[in-house]
Amino acid sequence: MNKEIIEVFDNTFPNRDYTIEIVNPEFTSVCPKTGLPDFGTITITYVPDKSCIELKSLKYYFLEFRNAGIFYENITNTILDHLVEACQPKSMTVKTDWNARGGITETVTVSYTAEK
């Protein structure tokens, strides 16, 4: 996934802690075992520091996964790593909720907290 797509902008309130939640209910990728499409909802919750994630670039970043054969756990951790690198938040959580396939659903949650 091309993490260089992710753009940020200056946080105009860096001295105030506030939470931003971004939800993408139409995330798609491909199962690396079966080649079948996977559909899920990605929820990103973060407390920005000096910069915030620009949403249009995030949309294009998510599209990078559309044809990628990648496991749920790898997707979730990769998104967290790339977004933390891009915006260096005070804290961030990425949660992926995957639609049922074969009667089984999965949710993966990963978190980051900056060292003080």
Swiss-Prot record:
Q: Where in the cell is it found?
A: Cytoplasm
The reply to whether Nuclease figures as a keyword in the UniProt entry is: no
GO cellular component labels = cytoplasm
The protein's matches in SUPFAM superfamilies, at most eight in alphabetical order, are given as: Tetrahydrobiopterin biosynthesis enzymes-like
- Give the coiled coil ranges: none
Key words, A-Z: Cytoplasm, NADP, Oxidoreductase, Queuosine biosynthesis
Which positions are annotated as binding substrate? Answer: I53, E54, L55, Y72, E73
Q: Name one GO biological process term.
A: tRNA modification
Q: Which catalysed reactions does the entry list for this protein?
A: 7-aminomethyl-7-carbaguanine + 2 NADP(+) = 7-cyano-7-deazaguanine + 2 NADPH + 3 H(+)
Active site (UniProt): C31, D38
Give the pathway listed in the UniProt entry for this protein. tRNA modification; tRNA-queuosine biosynthesis
Q: Name one Pfam family in it.
A: QueF
| EC number(s) from the headed UniProt entry | 1.7.1.13
What are the protein's GO molecular function terms?
Answer: preQ1 synthase activity
The similarity comment for this entry is: Belongs to the GTP cyclohydrolase I family. QueF type 1 subfamily.
Task of the protein: Catalyzes the NADPH-dependent reduction of 7-cyano-7-deazaguanine (preQ0) to 7-aminomethyl-7-deazaguanine (preQ1).
Entry-linked NCBIfam families: QueF-II
> What is this protein's name?
NADPH-dependent 7-cyano-7-deazaguanine reductase
Query: Which organism encodes this protein?
Result: Chlorobaculum parvum (strain DSM 263 / NCIMB 8327)
Recite the lineage of the species: Bacteria, Pseudomonadati, Chlorobiota, Chlorobiia, Chlorobiales
The UniProt gene name for this protein comes to queF
